[in-house]
C-alpha cells in the first residue's frame, strides 16, 4: 500500500539501510491472518534464503515491498538478477556481494480473496537450484575470494571430513 512508502524510504534517507524490504512475520498476532500453506512455504523459503544470501537476521524474502538506494542499485548486475519468483531471493544474494545493509520493515499480511498464481511444483526445482548456487557462490566469494581466514580453512577441512565420514559410513 502507498501509505507504507515512507516507512520503507526513511531508513535509506537516514543512512541506516541500503535496501529495505517488508516482513509480514514481524507481528506474530498478524501472522494468524496468513493462510497456513503460505505460512509454511514462506518459512521454508526464508530459511533457504538466509543460507544463500547470508542475511541471517532477515525473514520473508519473497515479500515484494522493497526500496533501494540509487547508489546501491547502480552497482547491481541487473542483467544477471533472476526474473520472476526467485527475483527477491536473488537480489538479496546480490546485495550481500556488495555488503549492502538490508533492513526488514514490519508490515501486515493482507490476503483478501486473491488467488496465488504460484505453483510450487513448477518453481521448487528453480528455487532449490538457485539457493544452492547462491550459497556456494557466497561461500566462495566471502571466504576464499575476498577474505581468506581461519574460517576458510575450517570450511575446507569440514567439507573433507564430512565427505570422508559419509563415504566411510556408507562403506561400513
Label each region the model flagged.
Residues 80-172:
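Hydrophobic helical membrane-anchoring modules
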Amino acid at each position: 500500500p502507498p501509505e507504507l512508502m515512507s516507512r520503507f524510504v526513511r531508513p535509506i534517507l537516514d543512512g541506516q539501510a541500503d535496501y529495505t524490504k517488508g516482513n509480514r512475520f514481524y507481528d506474530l498476532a498478524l501472522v494468524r491472518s496468513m493462510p497456513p500453506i503460505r505460512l509454511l512455504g514462506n518459512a521454508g523459503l526464508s530459511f533457504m534464503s538466509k543460507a544463500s544470501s547470508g542475511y541471517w537476521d532477515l525473514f520473508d524474502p519473497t515479500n515484494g515491498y522493497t526500496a533501494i538506494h540509487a547508489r546501491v542499485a547502480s552497482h547491481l548486475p541487473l542483467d544477471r538478477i533472476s526474473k520472476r519468483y526467485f527475483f527477491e531471493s536473488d537480489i538479496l544474494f546480490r546485495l550481500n556481494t556488495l555488503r549492502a545493509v538490508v533492513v526488514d520493515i514490519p508490515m501486515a499480511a493482507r490476503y483478501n480473496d486473491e488467488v496465488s498464481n504460484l505453483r510450487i511444483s513448477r518453481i521448487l526445482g528453480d528455487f532449490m537450484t538457485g539457493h544452492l548456487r547462491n550459497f556456494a557462490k557466497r561461500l566462495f566469494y566471502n571466504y576464499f575470494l575476498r577474505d581468506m581466514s581461519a574460517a576458510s580453512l575450517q570450511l575446507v577441512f569440514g567439507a573433507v571430513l564430512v565427505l570422508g565420514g559419509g563415504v566411510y559410513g556408507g562403506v561400513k
